[in-house]
């Protein structure tokens, strides 16, 4: 009688992960997350643009009650397009958003698994992916904060790390693995600029640590330059228009002090419990003592410390239960990023350089990247050496941290209730970071409404109305000249055109941050105001498109049987 084939432990972890990920697509809770309204409205705005015309959208023309908002120029949205398409064909935004968040978790798991597998094998890969994708940090980003950009960064950080590893630590001759570095960085740029800048800082730090290896193998420098150049080409359609806009327009986000790193560190208790548990403890203390708000603190993620405590114990308890040099390097980076996220006196030193990140515990993303990989390597080592007690303790602690994080999520959801997607408004533009600095009032569009002004000619008559994707101003009885201010937020790339004559008028930034233009050649007419884009925007699309097409062709060519045989 044949013995039944047992499923390996790694296989069981795969099954558990698959079940959790599948359930996530249906059961993602929708509480009042910090950024849920903003990102849900972004998807809705893209869907509305899709109904008007196909293409790459630089302005959400329906945002802010039709005033338009340039979020896509500064915050990549390409990964939202598939889910926006679902909304455009009738899928409910709540369902589309759930699918988006679930797909981020799936992609994070798969990305970590494939990247680690290519270097350390299946056993390490499945453990690293498990610890990474179900880490309290990613759970907080997806389920509590709804920080889509930071969550997407989890997908691409392993690819960046793999690219650096293949270039510097274990280079091949000849090698095209530097492309991984470019793909990872490109994905980060499209996902979240703050995470991109922090990753660049990480790469600089890695180069300093491994400077001897880089100096010994001069080709490494060439590979890095090639990766940087390819990244510029792939992301040109996004980065060049963004830089153009920033060079010509003063924005709300660059005109005001927005950072306070020292006030946004993760406290020590965050190693074990999130702020929601302190809120629960406050309720208990108030019931017993009558003292309200015994613990006063801003929100912070929690339960991310169990893993690092186990790693430190495994490495240093009784001179180390297990040893691994590469794991020690990863541990060093884990501790560094944990310190940056939690030690208040470090923040004033960092403020002048990275104050733009606003929240010190954003660095926990990098902490969990290194900690999950370090833990996976040590777990495999422990299993190989048959040290089962330490092995099981590590997995239990990591899983316990995840359960604690889920518990905090449940408390927040019960307290806040479900987010009513039906109340989404076109005025949901986050903190309004990408308004021009001239717009001093976040609610200006809502308060002013669809009102056009002309202050230098009291005889001209005019009416203003909006259509799909553009606005119109009809005027009559114009003698001499008149300067009109229309209710459209001004960004470089807007066009004002006379429907009858085809004449173009130069749009300028008004004192209120709106589109303003002067007419002095006709007495009446109909003017269209729409976003045409700039030459840089149009050319950059072709640069990125051609680059991606060439990469695909080269990839197919490299996989040809004849080419593969020659390599052998």
Each language-model region and where it sits:
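Membrane-embedded transmembrane-helix bundle of lipid-linked glycan/lipid transferases
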Residues: 1-417, 529-530, 536-568
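Generic detector of short, locally flexible boundary/turn motifs and exposed helical patches
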Residues: 9, 48, 61-62, 128-129, ...
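Active-site-proximal, structured, solvent-exposed surfaces of multi-pass membrane proteins
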Residues: 3-7, 446-568
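Membrane-interface segments at or immediately adjacent to transmembrane helices
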Residues: 415-468
């Amino acid at each position: 009688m044949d013995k039944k084939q047992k499923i390996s432990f790694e296989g069981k972890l795969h099954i558990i992960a698959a079940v959790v990920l599948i359930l996530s697509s249906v059961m993602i809770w929708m509480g009042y997350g910090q950024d849920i309204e903003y990102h849900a409205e972004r998807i809705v705005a893209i869907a509305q643009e899709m109904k008007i015309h196909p293409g790459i959208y630089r302005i959400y023309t329906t945002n802010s009650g039709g005033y338009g908002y340039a979020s896509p120029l500064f915050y990549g949205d390409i990964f939202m397009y598939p889910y926006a398409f679902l909304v455009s064909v009738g899928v409910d935004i709540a369902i589309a958003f759930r699918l988006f968040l679930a797909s981020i978790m799936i992609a994070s798991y798969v990305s970590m698994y494939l990247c680690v597998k290519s270097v350390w094998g299946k056993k390490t890969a499945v453990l690293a992916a498990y610890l990474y994708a179900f880490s309290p940090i990613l759970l907080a980003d997806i389920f509590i904060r709804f920080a889509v950009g930071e969550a997407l960064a989890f997908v691409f950080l392993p690819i960046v790390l793999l690219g650096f590893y293949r270039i510097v630590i274990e280079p091949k001759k000849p090698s095209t693995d530097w492309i991984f570095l470019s793909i990872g960085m490109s994905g980060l740029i499209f996902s979240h600029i703050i995470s991109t800048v922090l990753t660049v800082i990480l790469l600089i730090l890695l180069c300093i640590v491994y400077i001897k290896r880089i100096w010994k193998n001069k080709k490494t420098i060439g590979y890095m330059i090639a990766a940087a150049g390819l990244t510029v080409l792939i992301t040109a359609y996004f980065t060049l228009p963004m830089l153009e806009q920033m060079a010509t327009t003063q924005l709300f986000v660059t005109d005001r002090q927005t950072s306070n790193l020292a006030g946004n560190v993760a406290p020590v208790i965050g190693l074990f419990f999130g702020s929601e548990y302190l809120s629960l403890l406050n309720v208990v203390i108030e019931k017993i003592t009558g003292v309200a708000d015994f613990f006063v603190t801003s929100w912070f993620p929690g339960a991310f410390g169990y893993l690092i405590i186990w790693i430190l114990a495994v490495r240093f308890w009784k001179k180390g239960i297990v040893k691994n040099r590469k794991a020690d390097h990863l541990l060093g980076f884990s501790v560094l990023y944990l310190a940056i996220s939690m030690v208040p006196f470090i923040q004033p030193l960092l403020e002048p350089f990275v104050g733009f990140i606003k929240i010190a515990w954003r660095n926990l993303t990098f902490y969990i990247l290194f900690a999950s990989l370090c833990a996976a390597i040590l777990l495999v080592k422990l299993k190989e050496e048959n040290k089962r007690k330490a092995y099981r303790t590590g997995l239990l602690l990591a899983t316990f941290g995840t359960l604690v994080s889920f518990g905090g999520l449940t408390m927040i959801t019960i307290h806040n209730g479900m987010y009513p997607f039906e109340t989404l408004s076109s005025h949901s533009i986050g903190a309004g970071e990408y308004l021009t600095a001239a717009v001093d009032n976040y609610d200006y569009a809502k308060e002013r409404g669809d009102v056009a002004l002309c202050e230098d000619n009291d005889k001209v008559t005019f009416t203003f109305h909006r259509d799909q994707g553009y606005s119109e101003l009809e005027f009559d009885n114009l003698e001499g000249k008149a300067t009109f201010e229309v209710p459209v937020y001004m960004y470089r790339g807007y066009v004002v055109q006379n429907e009858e004559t085809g004449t173009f008028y130069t749009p300028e930034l008004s004192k209120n941050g709106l589109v303003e233009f002067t007419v002095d050649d006709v007495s009446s007419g109909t003017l269209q105001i729409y976003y045409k884009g700039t030459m840089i925007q149009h050319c950059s699309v072709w640069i990125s498109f051609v680059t991606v097409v060439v990469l695909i062709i080269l990839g197919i060519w490299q996989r040809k049987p004849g080419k593969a045989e020659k390599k052998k």
